[in-house]
């Protein structure tokens, strides 16, 4: 084989390997990368009856004053969520309905991704039936505690940006 043939072969192998999406040994799910969609489990419990939504986000339960739930970003109440992040299989928060670009409704009026939460009107109807246990029924953020939660959440997101 000529030098040009070896060069073309090397370039073809390089192009093929650049297009492949392998998973590293430490983060490959059981059953390989294609098994991810089928092996979802419920996310860990955290806080005061809440559920992990991301590596440092705990939502639901008695958070937010016990009136419809709320979310805590960071702190000791979300500590179990860091351990959940080390699980080889991904988890699916029980929030149910989608919101934003890639988020789920984690509490009434609150949309969370795995990194941050924001106020979202499409999540105002979130109740216990959606999957996350909230202590209130509907409209949980239409109260003084909920208003304070909204302000704290807006300030926290402003600090992150």
Curated annotation (Swiss-Prot):
SMART domains per record: NH
GO cellular component terms given for this protein: extracellular space; secretory granule
Principal localisation: secreted
Disulfide linkage: 23-28, 43-91, 46-58, 52-81, 59-71, 99-111, 105-123, 112-117
Gene3D superfamilies from the UniProt entry: Neurohypophysial hormone domain
Secreted is among the record's keywords: yes
UniProt-annotated location(s): Secreted
Keyword Disulfide bond included in the entry's annotation: yes
Listed GO MF terms: neurohypophyseal hormone activity
UniProt keyword list: Amidation, Cleavage on pair of basic residues, Disulfide bond, Hormone, Secreted, Signal
InterPro entries named among the record's database cross-references: Neurhyp_horm, Neurhyp_horm_dom_sf, Neurohypophysial_hormone_CS
Signal peptide: 1-22
Sequence positions bearing Glycine amide: 31
Protein role: Vasotocin is an antidiuretic hormone.
Sequence similarity: Belongs to the vasopressin/oxytocin family.
PANTHER family tied to this protein: ISOTOCIN, NEUROPHYSIN
Protein name, as recorded: Vasotocin-neurophysin VT
Organism from which the protein derives: Eptatretus stoutii (Pacific hagfish)
